[in-house]
């Protein structure tokens, strides 16, 4: 169990500080939380299609194996108690969700883009507004940019490699 906690803590830190902070969003959610559904729909179902370099990691906090990772994220975010969703993007942490956060995330993501990338994102956003289903169908590979975190899979991976 200590090994799992240690691995989860390390992975939790790497999720928060991964590569370029503006290219990674981590959502800590519960399947029974209505605001989590809104957050996941907007981020995993919209932003990931608008921003070709965005990766979204979703962490189901109702899975006990993911508890240490969630607790580490709360600690790093300076949150004293739980609650979901918790959304980590860049150096920002948000607990709860409203559509207003979507604009803030776009602003943060846009800050690291060059003009060509901004033009592409604007074009993608317009296409999503015109016909999201058609755009998603043409860009189905973007579904791979949404990762489901599993602490148990991380713990089992070294054993399977042997």
At which residue positions do the language-model features occur?
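Bacterial N-terminal signal peptides
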Residues: 5-14
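N-terminal signal peptide c-region/cleavage motif recognized by signal peptidases
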Residues: 16-18
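Local sequence-structure signature of Cys/Sec-based thiol-disulfide redox active-site neighborhoods
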Residues: 21-53
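Thiol-based oxidoreductase modules, predominantly thioredoxin-like and allied folds used
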Residues: 53-68
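Thiol/disulfide oxidoreductase modules built on the thioredoxin-like
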Residues: 73-83, 94-100
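Non-catalytic, surface beta->alpha helical segment in thiol-disulfide oxidoreductase systems
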Residues: 89-128, 132
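Small-residue-enriched transmembrane helix starts and helix-helix packing motifs
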Residues: 157-162
């Amino acid at each position: 169990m200590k090994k799992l906690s240690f691995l989860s803590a390390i992975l939790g830190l790497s999720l928060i500080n991964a590569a370029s902070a503006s290219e990674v969003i981590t959502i800590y959610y519960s399947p029974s939380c209505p605001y989590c559904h809104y957050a996941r729909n907007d981020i995993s179902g919209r932003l990931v299609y608008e921003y070709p370099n965005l990766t979204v990691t979703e962490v189901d906090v109702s899975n006990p194996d993911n508890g240490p990772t969630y607790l580490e994220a709360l600690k790093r975010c300076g949150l004293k108690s739980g609650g979901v969703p918790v959304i980590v993007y860049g150096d920002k942490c948000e607990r709860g969700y409203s559509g207003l956060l979507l604009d803030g995330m776009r602003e943060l993501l846009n800050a690291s883009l060059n003009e060509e990338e901004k033009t592409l994102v604007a074009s993608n956003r317009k296409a999503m507004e015109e016909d999201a289903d058609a755009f998603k169908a043409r860009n189905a590979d973007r579904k791979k940019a949404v990762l489901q975190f599993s602490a148990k899979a991380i713990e089992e991976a070294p054993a399977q490699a042997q």
